[in-house]
């Protein structure tokens, strides 16, 4: 989809400048002060970007979360010695990486080569990162070994370079899924999973192939997400148009898989006039998390500032001049987090607890306070 990729590049740049891709108040209230704050985010250093509060809404309670009636002032229990030794910080930032076409030889600015994908995933594996799905991230229930770091791998537009099955029923060589599985084989402990956000052209497959392919992905631990039928800019569409784009795609996914999706990624990162149009339509779709096309890691799902309706992502790219990738794309952010490990999400190894340094106690979302542990 060359034209879409060209448009995507332009829209993402505009989003950075205008602050459209950065999180803000849910459901309105965008006064001039807020707009100025978001517009300035593009010129901040990574540290400044993290420090700037965006007024997000709390994360939703997931399975095992604290009761809403739990006291917000109750003392937080001490962390396990092993968690403290691992320097766990489960209020740290989480990279949610955004990929588009995967090709042997990139053609457009958003493309990544199979080698670039392999090298980046290998870097993640060697750096102690462990992939989780977008749904697991949003729900705040995932398992990462103590001392490790979660990362969410997302692939937009369901292009042929993402996935396909050969005659033997195995992932086709040089596709994203094949590369992910190769890196997992070479790096024990690196979980082979990712989230694929689908448009109508399902990896270049017909409906029979798509049904088999989507079944294979789900059976092997990959997540399927909604990305609309035709990848339009939802910001300029009517309620009817927004619901048709999302609902028709959801109908097709449900027909092919027998299941509904949990998460949604905005095409171009563009939010419609009323966010509720995209979030839910009774009897048709209802998402638990919505992903943007932003330029910084996400806040932890346990942080009181986490907004599940506007989750930041980072474009996969090296430190190139285009779109200020020297500072805001994946290589730059991974370098930054390596140099500032205290700002990165580091797991305590126990999915039933949320461990962090005592100095960060005021940041824990109230619904997770009963699971909190400090040191």
Identify what each model region corresponds to.
Residues 31-41:
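Juxtamembrane extracytosolic/periplasmic "stalk" immediately C-terminal to the first targeting helix
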Residues 199, 229-230, 269, 295:
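Histidine- and/or cysteine-centered catalytic micro-motif in compact active-site loops
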Residues 167, 196-203, 230-239:
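Surface-exposed cleft-lining segments at the edges of enzyme active sites
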Residues 95-98, 130-134, 152-153, 176-207, ...:
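Short, well-structured secondary-structure segments
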Residues 1-26, 40-44, 48-51, 55-58, ...:
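C-terminal active-site subregion of NodB/CE4 polysaccharide deacetylases
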Residues 89, 144, 180-191, 205-225, ...:
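Acidic (Asp/Glu)-rich catalytic clusters
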